[in-house]
């Protein structure tokens, strides 16, 4: 019988999921791992939409005083009774999410940060009337509550001090999406000012805070320690290359199969794997949870639903765009290899500052890896060095789609800015100059990044070149009427062109050749098909009698052109 539990699309509150009857994949082992592998301050870096916020909400529900212990009944952590007795509901908790800190200028972003801090102060409003606190403490809290204390950098530490005094227990600090303010600041030109505030906040709250039991932070990027974590001792960073906690963010293969079985959709497991699997965190093979939950929800209402790019569409993909735009010829060749299903070997930096990201193409490789657009399938030792390089691949079909989209957008811009080549191409087509057509097409293709999957069937490869040529023709002369796959004669012609001259018409048939030596034969086959299928008939029906026919064959980044007047 299929599960009747609701699927929690977009719900990141652990208590809400548990109380309102949503499906939950148990990640409570993270609690045990954190407490057994003790660290004063732990930073988890994972790509966006990989369950960071839900896990932080789960930690808050477990540790915070007054928690509802029934939330954890039947979950992994409940089996460790000794740990639960010692730690569940034992700590005051400060929980902050910096996800909403945005702004086109520093003043706006600072105001948003203050609002988030105030929301957490409001959550602890009871401190205003605490009998344990002194009058001075309560006055300070009231000032902080009403935004009268401008010392924002000390606000988290001061709140933890007041909580410690009230409860007589050190505080757990949870900071989700710690790096979002830095990302937005870098994009909008106030990075140094934001770094100063975040460094001050963390320095006071995490470094010199005698009232801290432990802290957990999450984010996408591991910002260099020297940037905002200066001087922090006992500071542990857990990233996508680490084995510890490698199954606690994202879904494992077994978890995805069980979810699909629970909803009677196990036959769609291959689709889920092809589109959303492929991430390698530590030693674990991981699926993107945002994708899996969204796909499963679609399947519940429509068993034949096709996979969609849920993760990619949940925010912009500027990093891939910047990468493609910045790529030199060597990098473009490497991108082609990735899109074709291959791997590249790269030494990466996992601790960048945001203002270093665009400094080199190597830094962009690193960011694509840490943000989930690339994943590792192994490591290789760098010759004459003690260092290792990662073997990087595009993780799955969904991410491959975003690379293809950005490559197509980049190529359109390249073509649009090359008026000379486009004019020469259109003139050569009208003049039946096969050599010049070949030359101009080869020039354009030498600049492009191929998005061909080497494992794709020949028909798909032919469609790729068809689409490429169609785009070039539309860019070469905006006054031409160009039709694709239109019925003509005894079939469907690849491309028909109606130039400004009312008597002129052009027929083009596209072929794919596996090897360079097959280009001439492919051109001849294209020309024979045009004649045998009478693809010129639709143009003649329009009164166009001066017809040129072209057979154009492609192999990798080269082409051959045969032409004839019909």
Residue locations for each model-derived region?
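Substrate-engagement module of ASCE P-loop NTPases
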Residues: 121, 155-166, 193-213, 535-538
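Walker A/P-loop-proximal flanking segment of P-loop NTPase domains
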Residues: 1-64, 68-80
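Domain-level recognition of nuclease-like catalytic cores that cleave nucleotide substrates
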Residues: 538, 542-566
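Sensor-1/coupling segment of RecA-like P-loop NTPase cores
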Residues: 180, 190-232
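Amphipathic alpha-helical segments of the small helical/lid subdomains adjacent to P-loop NTPase cores
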Residues: 225-232, 238-297
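P-loop NTPase motor core
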Residues: 10, 61-126
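Conserved P-loop NTPase mechanochemical-coupling segment
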Residues: 9-18, 101-104, 108-153, 181-186
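Extended alpha-helical interface modules used as scaffolds for assembling large macromolecular complexes
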Residues: 235, 287-534, 559-566
């Amino acid at each position: 019988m299929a599960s009747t539990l609701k699927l929690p699309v977009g719900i990141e509150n652990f208590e809400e999921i548990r109380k309102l009857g949503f499906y939950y994949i148990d990640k409570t082992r993270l609690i045990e791992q954190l407490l057994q592998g003790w660290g004063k301050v732990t930073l988890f870096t994972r790509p966006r939409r990989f369950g960071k916020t839900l896990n932080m909400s789960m930690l808050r529900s477990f540790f915070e005083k007054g928690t509802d212990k029934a939330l954890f009944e039947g979950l992994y952590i409940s089996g460790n009774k000794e740990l639960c007795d010692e730690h569940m509901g034992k700590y005051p908790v400060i929980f902050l999410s910096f996800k909403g800190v945005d702004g086109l200028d520093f003043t706006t972003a600072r105001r948003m940060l203050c609002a988030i801090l105030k929301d957490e102060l409001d959550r602890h409003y009871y401190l205003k009337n605490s009998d344990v606190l002194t009058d001075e403490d309560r006055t300070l809290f009231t000032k902080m509550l009403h935004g009268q204390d401008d010392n924002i950098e000390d606000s988290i530490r001061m709140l933890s001090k007041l909580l410690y005094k009230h409860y007589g227990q050190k505080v757990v600090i949870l900071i989700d999406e710690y790096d979002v303010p830095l990302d937005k600041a870098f994009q909008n030109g106030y990075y140094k000012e934001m770094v100063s505030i975040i460094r001050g906040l963390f320095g006071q709250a995490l470094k010199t805070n005698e009232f801290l039991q432990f802290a957990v932070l999450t984010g996408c990027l591991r910002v260099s320690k020297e940037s905002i974590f200066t001087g922090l001792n006992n500071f542990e960073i857990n990233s996508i290359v680490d084995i510890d906690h490698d199954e606690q963010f994202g879904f494992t293969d077994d978890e995805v199969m069980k979810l699909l079985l629970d909803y009677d959709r196990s036959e769609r497991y291959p689709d889920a794997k092809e589109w959303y699997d492929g991430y390698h965190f530590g030693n674990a093979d991981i699926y993107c949870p945002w994708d899996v939950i969204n796909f499963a929800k679609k399947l519940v209402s429509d068993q034949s639903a096709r996979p969609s790019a849920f993760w990619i569409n949940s925010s912009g993909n500027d990093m891939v765009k910047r990468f493609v735009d910045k790529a030199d010829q060597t990098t473009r060749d490497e991108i082609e290899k990735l899109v074709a299903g291959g791997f590249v070997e790269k030494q990466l930096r996992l601790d960048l500052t945001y203002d270093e990201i665009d400094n080199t193409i190597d830094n962009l490789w690193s960011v694509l890896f840490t943000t989930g657009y690339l994943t590792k399938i192994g490591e290789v030792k760098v010759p004459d060095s003690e260092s290792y390089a990662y073997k990087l691949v595009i993780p799955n079909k969904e991410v491959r789609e975003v690379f293809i989209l950005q490559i197509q957008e980049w190529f359109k811009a390249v073509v649009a800015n090359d008026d000379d080549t486009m004019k020469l191409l259109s003139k050569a087509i009208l003049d039946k100059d096969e050599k010049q057509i070949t030359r101009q097409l080869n020039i354009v293709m030498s600049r492009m990044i191929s998005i061909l999957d080497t494992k794709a069937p020949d028909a798909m490869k032919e469609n790729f070149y068809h689409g490429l040529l169609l785009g070039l023709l539309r860019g070469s002369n905006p006054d031409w009427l160009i039709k694709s796959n239109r019925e003509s004669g005894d079939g469907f012609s690849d491309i028909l062109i109606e130039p400004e001259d009312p008597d002129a018409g052009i027929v083009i048939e596209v072929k794919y050749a596996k090897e360079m030596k097959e280009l001439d034969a492919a051109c001849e086959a294209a020309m024979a098909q045009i004649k045998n299928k009478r693809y010129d008939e639709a143009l003649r029906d329009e009164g166009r009698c001066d017809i040129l026919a072209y057979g154009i064959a492609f192999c990798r980044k080269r082409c051959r052109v045969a032409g004839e007047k019909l």
